[in-house]
UniProtKB/Swiss-Prot annotation:
Alphabetical list of Gene3D superfamilies matching this protein: Kelch-type beta propeller (2.120.10.80)
Lineage: Eukaryota, Viridiplantae, Streptophyta, Embryophyta, Tracheophyta
Organism this protein belongs to: Arabidopsis thaliana (Mouse-ear cress)
UniProt name for this protein: F-box/kelch-repeat protein At4g39580
Annotated keywords: Kelch repeat, Repeat
Superkingdom per UniProt: Eukaryota
Amino acid sequence: MNEEEAPSEQKKTLSLVPSPTTNLFLPDDILLSSLSRISRLYYPTFSLVSKSFRSLIASPELYQTRSILGRTESCLYVSLRLLNDSNLRWYTLCRVPDRKLTNFSGGHLLVPILSRYAPPAHWSSVVAVDYNIYAIGGPINDAPSSSVSVLDCQCEKWREAPSMRVARNYPTATVLDGKIYVAGGCEDCTSLDCIEVFDPKTQTWDSVASPGTERCERLVYKSVGIEGKYHLFGGAGHVAYDPKEGRWDSVGMDMEMGRTWVSYCVINNILFYYNDREFKWYDYKGRFWRKLMGLERLIKFLCYSRVNLAAYGEKMAVLWDTFVPSSSKNKMIWCAEITIERHDIYEICGKTEWFDVVLRVPKSYELVHVLAATV
């Protein structure tokens, strides 16, 4: 939709039921070849055709074919939590094949994933590596946890991965060069495993050299992976780890944002964040934050909302919920897709491709995680 006007809040109807003329008798190899060439965003709709289609869409053969054909793409996943419920509801963004079927002008919806089971990962740190989403640490049942749960986004089923070496509360996890770095939340800050790294290929955990006991003792707020370095932000400042050299360096306070980072993401080695009605990006050369231009109209719709950012391929996904009066029973989850355009070394602009309501939920639901997996 045009970002100058919001869609009507009237009740919107949707029919995703496929045409009864759909041919269900094609050989599986032809169906696989055809489905592999279609955007993954349409798969939730095709899964409604029949059990046979549902099985094909969750089959490893389909995703092997997509990979061979170079058809993998970024797919957005979102978790919501009902008040006083530790379990999460997971959704994925899909496209409606025929926009005439819906009054949602953007043609996008959040639909539940196939798996009904989801680990209690409200306070876990969640990251994606390829087509797997990892929910790491706790608290779970009010206690630190070393558990790691994995959502396979191809078949949309959860499984358990090897546990961390130490249990953690509120850890921060970051993906760098295909490995997952985890810090914070451990009770013994002098432990050699205060910071750990997980290799999804070997399914093993290893310790990372500590930046110092003082830095580990102070609360770690955030972490990011940029230009081959693992950055930690916390009460003791900002430090960066170079895995190739095995060395920590103090970066200083110029980039430090601590708890004020409401939401952030890294796209093409550029750090973006949203807070206090502003989108900003970090200029490494000038060593200060610059305003992300071009999103002034979108910001008007973000007031009084909890905003989540996610790297969505080379684009940015922005999700937020609407402020609702006490008399309302439901609220709306919105999504915007932003193209990032660099005009010169000093200016980056965002262009809103579309934004729309993608889900309507009871107002007691909370938007928790937003991230993209490559499927």
